[in-house]
Amino acid sequence: IGFVKHDIENITGTTTMIFDVNQLSIDKVVLDDNEPTQFVIGNYDDVKGSPMEVTVKPETKSVTIYYSTQPNSKALQWLAPQQTAGKKFPYLFTQGEAVLTRTWIPCQDTPQNRITYDATLQVPSNLLALMAADNNPTEKNTEGKYAYTMDIPIPTYLIALAVGDLEFQATGERTGVYASPVLLEAATYEFAEVEEMIKVTESLYGDYQWGRYDILVLPTSFPYGGMENPKLTFATPTIITGDRS
């Protein structure tokens, strides 16, 4: 349960703005200074979900959508404790590619649309929350509240989230590894040379443009070899071989 606020520039003066949604429960939509507005959710398609048409004004500057996700959201992967390496705490990770971000955020879910964002998350205090963005924490806090910023325009499928019993170990000034405590030592050894790899690449192709480059080692149920989420690659634990290959 939460909300998303879209800051917009209504260049054409349209009175209808269309968002992509897929099996989301929409509570209400408001414009600018909390002004309620009408919305209509169109016909459902198994792949694309539904168009959500929101009534706006030519002068509208923001559209805020209050909503909740569903247990069957295709982008949200919920794992029970026994499905994790540590076996003690549940785990959540998202996978937005190709058009699944609309199953957890009402948005214009196409690669043509590049967005920046700020996000605030509230999670249980015994878990750590990460996003593919700036300001990722390196340790849990007692409030379980975290804030993030992505100031480089990205397609919506690269909005990524992970929540679990995670710890961090730096591998360089701008690189590090997040993993379950039982995997952290092995993961840190495996990726210890990432900072040097970046430096070599920069000597050939120019400066790395994204600030930090961290790696999150996910549970074995992660269905990809890796996902190129900006600033925080999501990686399968099967690449931890012990020989840095």
Predicted features by range, described:
Residues 1, 32, 79, 85-91, ...:
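N-terminal, polar/Ser/Thr-rich
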Residues 23-84:
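A surface-exposed beta-strand-loop module
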Residues 37-58, 93-102, 236-245:
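Aromatic/His-enriched, Gly/Pro-containing loop or helix-boundary segments
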Residues 12-14, 56-62, 125-126, 140-143:
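A short, structured loop/turn motif at beta-sheet edges
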Residues 15-24:
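Aromatic-lined ligand-binding clefts that engage carbohydrates, nucleic acids, or primary amines
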Residues 2, 95-99, 107-245:
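Hydrophobic helix-coil surface modules that form long, contiguous segments used
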Residues 6-8, 67, 104, 121:
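Hydrophobic beta-strand positions in extracellular immunoglobulin-like domains
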